[in-house]
From Swiss-Prot:
UniProt-listed PANTHER family: MYC, TRANSCRIPTION FACTOR BHLH13
Gene Ontology molecular function: any one: protein dimerization activity
Key word Repeat present: no
Record-linked InterPro entries: AIB/MYC-like, bHLH_dom, HLH_DNA-bd_sf, MYC/MYB_N
Gene3D superfamilies membership: Helix-loop-helix DNA-binding domain
Originating species: Solanum lycopersicum (Tomato)
Protein name: Transcription factor MTB2
Region (Helix-loop-helix motif): 442-477
Region of interest (Basic motif), ranges: 428-441
PROSITE patterns the UniProt entry points to: BHLH
Residue stretches of biased makeup (Low complexity): 382-392
Biased composition (Basic and acidic residues): 393-415, 425-439
Amino acid sequence: MTMLWSDEDKTMVAAVLGTKAFDYLMSSLVSAECSLMAMGSDENLQNMLSDLVERPNASNFSWNYAIFWQISRSKLGELVLGWGDGCCREAREGEESELTRILNIRLADEAQQRMRKRVLQKLHMFFGGTDEDNYVSGLDKVTDTEMFFLASMYFSFPRGQGGPGKCFTAGKHVWLSDVMRSSVDYCSRSFLMKSAGMQTVVLIPTDIGVMELGSVRTIPESLELVHSIKSCFSSFLAQVRAKQAAPLAAVVAEKKNGNNSVFPSSFPFDQSKENPKIFGQNLESGSTEFREKLALRKPVDGPLEMYRNGNRAPIINTQNGVRPVSWASFGNVKPGNSVDLYSPQAPPNNLREFVNGGREELRLNSLQHQKPGGMQIDFTNSRPVVSPVPTVESEHSDVEVSCKEKHAGPADERRPRKRGRKPANGREEPLNHVEAERQRREKLNQRFYALRAVVPNISKMDKASLLGDAIAHITDMQKRIRDAEYKLEKRGSTSVDAADINIEAASDEVIVRARCPLGTHPVAKVVEAFKETQVSVVESKLAVGNDTVYHTFVVKSSGPEQLTKEKLMAAFAGESNSL
């Protein structure tokens, strides 16, 4: 964070982000490049957030964005709420309010677009980004929603600061249903949020972070929804502990001295029988696909390292991204399902189950007993590879070199470079949801362009009028097809009737007379044109020569108007209605 800001840059960034957001970022001592301690694979978290944003419920409602603020450790060693993952989408047609539509007019301003891209570029470089992983150059247009979403990636919230920090400290959810008209700036990102047209913002604390949801609609508060989302995103930590308790149970069986026991023989967890629901969808039995997304990577059951003093301390292998975390420095917070995993000196009778916030003195102290180990995130692969190196404080903490060599291997070979902050903690395509939304809009616009090229007589150039004209044109074409099919059927039914043929023989010649309905005769259209122009046939002759039939008509006008050649030509050309 040694980058110098000119007065012009400060004015530009403050105009885009808001003065409060800019001052917060500049005064924050927490680097956005912090060591994130993931509570499960990124795919699971991203899929859950995508379900909240991209899968409408029965009422065709879904959130416009979802951000999970995860407990993270900064370079200075303090715990903060940092960017865990997120997903966003643009407002659908008819979903945004009138005020939102007015705000979207600014997208056509090229100067505004250049300013937004420049601000994102400045933030990217300010927070340790490089030209190699710069995503700003690939952006075409930055909408208000995308600007709010991308700028939020650079925020982190210590204890009691910002909306997420205050929500997590208080342990209570925040539901704002009228953000656009509210004068309360509950968060430093309020200006960006209002610029994106968000009407409803919800903050829900969990035991591992804060879930933030937003919508351009005004949504009334729902405690059932809050409870469902809270239990759903809090289930990560409970599943991790349940899996970690199994391999550690073997340590208890080996201990004959009760004072050296680390875990009781069985560790109960309160499992609710009621299946959580989000938008009325059952997450347990009704949707196996959603439960699969909640699956966590199984921790490696590696042997416990022996200290020279003879005591065994549990060291959880975190190479697959599973690691217990708690905001232990937040004294006012009581995270649920918390257990002291790193206190071998504590007697076994102090170990009690924690369900939905138990006794505060027995909470998880793993982060207090650990030094901030190095964590590197690989941004080169589609699946993140996290290699944290935990260090347990002890006066005999030097472990045998052979133990280190035993665990060294592929992880050391693929040790990645640490880069600046990128969304979604290192996926190869960090902005896939933003790009997908942009590609969807571009594809939709291309379809409208193609439709506008084939629809005649367009009344207006807007999309609604174009769709209406296309519907009218298709309806007219269908009517014409039905009329043509009816005429073909009528002609086919009359053609099966045999023509009335009369043959008369004279002395030197034979007279053949053929009679058939006018509609089936080849000259029927000519006769119809005569009728429309009020012309009567005086004489008709038929001659055949050189494989050609010559039909000659002698006509005269039966109306008051004079018969001209132009009128007959217009009638034969199908323009008799203009006469």
